[in-house]
Every structure is written in C-alpha cells, then in structure tokens.
Regions:
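Helical substrate-recognition/capping region of FAD-dependent monooxygenase/halogenase enzymes
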Residues: 104, 173-377
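Core Rossmann-like FAD-binding/catalytic domain of the broad FAD-dependent monooxygenase superfamily
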Residues: 1-221, 310, 351, 377
C-alpha cells in the first residue's frame, strides 16, 4: 500500500486510467459486469543473450494444442520475447511461476539459461468485464479501468487508446469553453457498445484457442481444415453518437468507419497525413474547398469548431495536399463521394458529393448544437 505523503489536487475532471484494479473506479462505486470468460495463463518474458538468436517460433502465433494452448510473441521491442502458457486443471500459480518450471516450458524452443535470461514470470487471469458506468459526474473511466478482455485479438491497449482519443476531443471542447459537460455523455454512448463487441470477438477467439479436450480440439481442427469453421465478423465500426445518419436514423455509408492514413506531400514536406494535419476535425475534399456548396454560416461553424479543410489531389496544385500513392483517391472512388468529414479520433463522421457538403456540415451542427455554448461555436 502507498505510504507516502498525501497531496490535494484540484481539477475540472478526473480520468481514471489506473488499470484493472482501478482505485478511481472503486472510489466512485462503479461495479463490473462479468461477460463470462476467465482463464489463468502463465506469461514468461525472456531476453536472448544474442538479440539475433534464431528461435523457431512465429513472430506472433497461437498454438491450439489441447495438451497446453500456447501464445508466442518473438519480438517485444528489439530484444525481448514472450511466451504464454494456459494453466491446466490442478496447476497453481506458485507451481507454474517457479523458475525451473518456466525453463522446462521454454525448452520446447531450445531456450535455456545458457542462451537467455527470464525477466518476468507471472500468472494473469484473462477476463472479460465491462464497467457498468463509465462516467459519474466529473469522473470518467478509460482503458482497463473501464473494460477487460482476453488478449487473443491484441485489442486491450488498442481499445484504451480509442477511449482516450474519443474522450480527448470532447474534453477539449468542454475545457476550452465551447461545449457543456453534457457532451461527455456521448463518450459512454459511443465507446461502450463498441468495446463490448470487441470483447465478444476476443472471447470467441479465446474459446477456439483454449480448448483442452482432445475430442473437441479434433472437431475444431477438422472444421478449419474442411472450411466449415465460421468466419469471424468484420471488425466493428462505431454505430452510436455523432455520425451522419439517414432518415431512418442508421449511419450512412462509411460513417463510423476509420479514415485512411495515406502518404501525402504538403508545402514540400512528405509524411503521413496525421503528421501533416495534426489533431482535430478534418474536412477533406478532392475538389477545391471554395467550390463546395458551403454557406457563410457553415464556414463560420467549421472555423469555430477548429475544422481543418483540405483539398487533396494527385495533381500538384497550390495549397493542395498531394495524394502521393492515390490512397485517398481510391478510397473516395470506392465510397462514391467527393468529400469526407473526419472526427478528431479518426472515425469518419460522414461522406458527401460536393453539392451535398453543406448538408453534411449542417447535420453535424445540428447534432452538436444542443451541447455547444452559443457564444463560442
């Protein structure tokens, strides 16, 4: 337990990003909703004495072995590796974390004390949980403080980054005096159902990997060999919150999907688009911005919201962003549109033809307006 001096800090908001055993979550009385996955796995991190040592394991792999399911990660950074072993019935954390036992398990890949050093050995319980609330007044939860998932899709930290990106742009509007705190209600609305779907996908992969019954494992293997195994659904898009919507309320084409990350050139600098434009809302168009049918009030709204407007083209046009590899061109061709409005968290708000750009901006204004402070935006 912490035994250092106490300090009092005053802030507008408190973000609990303090992990699965979150003190912040417990402090505001938020409970877990258990989605029903729980397996103990031994995690062993090791460092080869020679970083270039040949090890016969995939860069990232799942061994669906009923005798003991295993996950391997050849490279963690430039010099470390990781192997994870599922605990079998009757095995304890104390037994499995014994150094001699870890070397015994690693010997499968000819990893020994002579050629490597174990730097960590611990047992984790892989779980699937969601906090029942992500916001209570001026306290919000992100990352493992808000959700836990099995690691089989590698989406735990990714989901936490999505949380931060989603909450960040909304907090910016609130703290800069442009929006009311009601805007923050959309954080839970948008992120919770998305991460719940990701957890369910991770659980499904975990169920495939963690089979230890030989007969069931044989059935699984045959279903893959024969092609009868069902495919996993596509990675989820955003479906709730601030998205361009059709008359029936459903997101329009591309709304809620992730934007592209092309190589571009702007004012003599070549880089990825995000490095050129920075953070914030972005209106990208393959026709010059002045040719879009935007009213003065729409232009004023975009300016107050801090929206960056970009003309992106393959031609070398003054003040335009050059689409070096035609990634944006192909993307917009596939979307059958000229214009795309991208949120600060890089999700697409909506797309439009140049003649409908004003309607696209107007729909965003109508969605945000109930939360905006009138004198600011």
């Amino acid at each position: 337990k912490a035994d250092g001096p106490c300090r009092t800090v005053t802030a507008g908001f408190l973000i609990g990003s303090d992990g699965a055993n979150s003190v912040v979550r417990d402090g505001i009385g938020v409970s877990w909703v258990d989605l029903g996955f729980e397996e103990d796995w031994l995690v062993v991190d090791f460092k080869p004495h020679d970083p270039e040592m040949e090890i016969d394991m995939p860069g990232a792999g799942q061994y669906c072995d009923p005798e003991r399911p295993v996950s391997t990660f050849r490279w963690l950074g430039r010099s470390h590796s990781r192997v994870e072993f599922m605990l079998l019935p009757g095995e304890t954390a104390e037994q499995m974390t014994a150094e001699s036992r870890c070397w015994e398990l690693l010997s499968r890949w000819k990893i020994t004390p002579d050629n490597a050093t174990i730097i960590r050995r611990t047992v984790y319980t892989f779980q699937s949980k969601l906090a029942d609330q992500w916001r209570r007044d001026r306290v919000l939860l992100i990352g493992d403080a808000a959700h836990l998932m099995p690691p089989f899709m590698g989406q735990g930290m990714c989901s936490g980054i999505r949380d931060a990106a989603n909450l960040g742009w909304k907090l910016d509007l609130v703290l800069s005096g442009r929006a009311e705190a009601t805007l923050l209600d959309s954080y839970t609305e948008e992120r919770r159902p998305h991460v719940e779907t990701v957890i369910e996908l991770s659980m499904e992969l975990g169920r495939i990997v963690c089979i230890s019954d030989p007969a069931l494992a044989a059935e699984r293997d045959e279903s893959f060999r024969s092609g009868r195994a069902p495919t996993l659904p596509e990675f989820p898009s955003l479906t709730e919150g601030f998205l361009h919507r059709a008359i029936d309320g459903q997101p329009t084409a591309a709304a809620g999907t992730l934007s592209v990350q092309p190589r571009v050139c702007y004012q003599g600098r070549t880089a990825l688009l995000d490095d050129i434009i920075g953070s914030g809302w972005t209106l990208m168009s393959r026709v010059p911005i002045h040719r879009l049918e935007l009213s003065p009030s729409h232009s004023s709204f975009l300016s107050a919201l801090g929206v960056r407007t970009l003309h992106i083209t393959q031609a070398e046009v003054a003040e335009a962003v050059i689409d070096i590899d035609a990634d944006v061109t192909r993307w917009l061709d596939g979307l059958d549109s000229d214009v795309v409005l991208v949120r600060p968290d890089f999700y697409v708000y909506g797309i439009a033809w140049r003649s409908d750009a004003g309607a696209l901006v107007e729909s965003l204004r109508q969605q945000l307006e109930p939360h905006l402070i009138k004198t600011s935006v």
